[in-house]
Amino acid sequence: MTKKEKKSFNQSLAEWKRFIYNPTSGEFLGRTAKSWGLILLFYLVFYGFLAALFTFTMWVMLQTLNDEVPKYRDQIPSPGLMVFPKPLSALEYTFSASDPSSYRGYIEDLRKFLKPYTLEEQKNLTVCPDGILSEQKGPVYVACQFPIFLLQACSGMSDPDFGYSQGSPCVLVKMNRIIGLKPEGTPRIECIPKDENVASISTYPNNGIIDLKYFPYYGKKLHVGYLQPLVAAQVIFSANSTKKEVTVECKIDGSPNLKNQDDRDKFLGRVAFKIIARA
C-alpha cells in the first residue's frame, strides 16, 4: 500500500480557487448562476409565503379583539388589595421617627403616588353624586373626582410627612381595577391590628368607606383620567406599649359580591403588612 501523496500548498490553494469560481464551467461555490438563481427564487417565494401567512393569521386574530375592552379577563370576580408606599421588602415598613432618612423613601413614594389626586390634576374630572354607581353608555366616559382631603391626616396636606415623623405612619390601600365591577351594598376596607394592645388603626375616609360612584370602571382607553378610590390606614402606637411592632390586616368588607376569603387564594380581597417603628 502506497502512501497518498501530500498536496502542496499551491495545489490546495488552486483547488480552493477553483471551488470558489470555476472559469471552465462558470460555477460559483459549486453552482452555476442558473442554479443559484433557482435556489434564491425558491427561498424568496417560500419565506414570502410564510410571512404572508403569518400576517394574514395575525390580521384575522386582531379582527376578533376589541380595541377598548380585553376579550379575555380574569375569572376572579373580586379584586385584590395593594398598599402604598411600596415596602422595601416583604410588605414590611421599618423606620425611625427620629431619623428622616429612614422614611424619606416612603414619603417620596406617597407624594408621587398621590400627585394625580391633587386638586390641580383633578380640575378636569367630574364631581359625581355620592352613593350611586356611575353607569355610563358612552361614547364619552367621565371620571369622578376623588377629593384628597378625604384622606385627612394621611392626605399629605396637613402633614407632609404622612405621620412618619410622629411615629404614626400612614399606608394607603386600594383595590385592583376590574372592568365592569359593580360592588353591592356599602363596600369598605377594614384594617385591624393583630395586637390591639400595641396599636390602633384610624382609617380615612371614615370607616374606610369606598363610594359606589367610582364604579364601574370601563377600561384604560375608554375611562381616561379614572382615579381609583383610596383608603388610608394610620397606625397609632399605644403610649403605654414599649413594643413598636405590629402586623396590620386590611380586607374588603360590606359588599356581598366582593370576597375577602378564598381557599385557593388567601390574598383575595385582603392584604397584610408589618410596621416596625424603631427608636
UniProtKB/Swiss-Prot annotation:
Main location (coarse class): membrane
Keyword vocabulary terms for this entry: Cell membrane, Disulfide bond, Glycoprotein, Ion transport, Membrane, Potassium, Potassium transport, Signal-anchor, Sodium, Sodium transport, Sodium/potassium transport, Transmembrane, Transmembrane helix, Transport
Stretches of the chain found on the membrane's Cytoplasmic side: 1-35
Glycan-modified residues: 124, 240
Pfam families reported in the protein's UniProt record: Na_K-ATPase
InterPro entries in UniProt: Na/K_ATPase_sub_beta (IPR000402), Na/K_ATPase_sub_beta_sf (IPR038702)
Residue pairs linked by disulfide bridges in the UniProt entry: 128-144, 154-170, 191-250
Extracellular topological intervals: 57-279
Gene Ontology molecular function: ATPase activator activity
Transmembrane regions: 36-56
Coiled coil: none
Topological relation to the membrane, as annotated: Single-pass type II membrane protein
UniProt-annotated stretches for the region immunoglobulin-like: 186-279
Listed GO CC annotations: apical plasma membrane; basolateral plasma membrane; melanosome; sodium:potassium-exchanging ATPase complex
The family this protein is said to belong to: Belongs to the X(+)/potassium ATPases subunit beta family.
Subunit structure: The sodium/potassium-transporting ATPase is composed of a catalytic alpha subunit, an auxiliary non-catalytic beta subunit and an additional regulatory subunit. Interacts with catalytic alpha subunit ATP12A.
The record's note on its domains: The C-terminal lobe folds into an immunoglobulin-like domain and may mediate cell adhesion properties.
Reported function: This is the non-catalytic component of the active enzyme, which catalyzes the hydrolysis of ATP coupled with the exchange of Na(+) and K(+) ions across the plasma membrane. The exact function of the beta-3 subunit is not known.
PANTHER family cross-referenced by the UniProt entry: SODIUM/POTASSIUM-DEPENDENT ATPASE BETA SUBUNIT, SODIUM_POTASSIUM-TRANSPORTING ATPASE SUBUNIT BETA-3
Name recorded for this polypeptide: Sodium/potassium-transporting ATPase subunit beta-3
